[in-house]
Amino acid sequence: MDSNTVSSFQDILMRMSKMQLGSSSEDLNGMITQFESLKLYRDSLGEAVMRMGDLHSLQSRNGKWREQLSQKFEEIRWLIEEMRHRLKITENSFEQITFMQALQLLLEVEQEIRTFSFQLI
């Protein structure tokens, strides 16, 4: 995985964890958890692509990996919509920058997961 992407994930997760969004802190914690989950999933797909011989191992280990892939794309779409919504409602520039960078990172991760999955199909 690209070291810039790793630091981007870490930076955004750290900044999101420091935000105080009042009653929506549970939503924010959920977003942070999903971000971490997507990072791990993207990393595992990338590793499987690097070891193309692992495709059969991946499929036998997780017969439902296409279903899982579909679920991850749904999570990404939800997070993208949530980031867009947060960008519209927040007036705090720190939060705007964080959500904008998170949105950009989500779009990059979505593209990477698509690329990895096409290589595995």
From Swiss-Prot:
Keyword check for Transport: yes
Name listed for the protein in its UniProt record: Nuclear export protein
Compartments it resides in: Virion; Host nucleus
Function: Mediates the nuclear export of encapsidated genomic RNAs (ribonucleoproteins, RNPs). Acts as an adapter between viral RNPs complexes and the nuclear export machinery of the cell. Possesses no intrinsic RNA-binding activity, but includes a C-terminal M1-binding domain. This domain is believed to allow recognition of RNPs bound to the protein M1.
Organism this protein belongs to: Influenza A virus (strain A/Anas acuta/Primorje/695/1976 H2N3)
Principal place of residence: virion
Gene Ontology CC annotations of this record: host cell nucleus; virion component
Family of the protein in this entry: Belongs to the influenza viruses NEP family.
Additional detail: Average number present in a viral particle is estimated to be 130-200 molecules.
Gene (name only): NS
Subunit text: Interacts with protein M1. May interact with host nucleoporin RAB/HRB and exportin XPO1/CRM1.
Key words of the record: Host nucleus, Host-virus interaction, Transport, Virion
Disulfide bonds: none
Chain ranges for the short sequence motif Nuclear export signal as given in the UniProt record: 12-21, 85-94
GO biological process terms on file: exit of virus from host cell nucleus through nuclear pore
